[in-house]
Amino acid sequence: DSRYGLARLQDGSLIISKFEKKRNKYVLKGNSIQDGDIVDIRDNGKSLTSYAIGVEPNSAEIDQIHIKVGMEEIMEINIAPNYAAIYHIDIPNNIEGWGVEYKERDE
């Protein structure tokens, strides 16, 4: 069980990183995804598509992003409060059934 989340490095830069669940808490895993990287999304090992991802500092309106293929959610990105929001997801429009759902934080 793993998910993607936002992490802030000591130099202040923001990265999208993979977290793995260990003993009921998520811990940072290696191979962090940096701002602007092209990310390959796979479903059961089969490559579906790639998309570019970016983070924008000082923007915390979005709490969570769900990426779905059809009705099936294949990735959930959680954004830590007061960190940043993902502002660009470039999903090729030749893939049917793609959807990106934004969950805004309740104040």
Where are these regions (language model features)?
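Short proline/glycine-enriched turn/loop motifs at strand-loop junctions of beta-rich domains
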Residues: 12, 57-63, 93-95
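Extracellular ectodomain segments of secreted/surface proteins
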Residues: 23-24, 29-52
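Surface-exposed, polar helix/loop patches in the mature regions of secreted/periplasmic/lumenal proteins
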Residues: 48-70
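Acidic surface patches and DE-rich sequence motifs
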Residues: 9, 20-22, 33, 69, ...
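Exposed beta-strand-loop-beta-strand "reactive/processing" segments of non-cytosolic proteins
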Residues: 1-19
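Ser/Thr-rich low-complexity repeats and stalk/linker segments
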Residues: 64-107
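Short acidic/glycine-enriched loop/turn segments that link adjacent beta-strands
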Residues: 1-2, 48-49, 81-83
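Short amphipathic beta-strand/extended segments with alternating polar/hydrophobic composition
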Residues: 17-20, 29-32, 76-79, 107
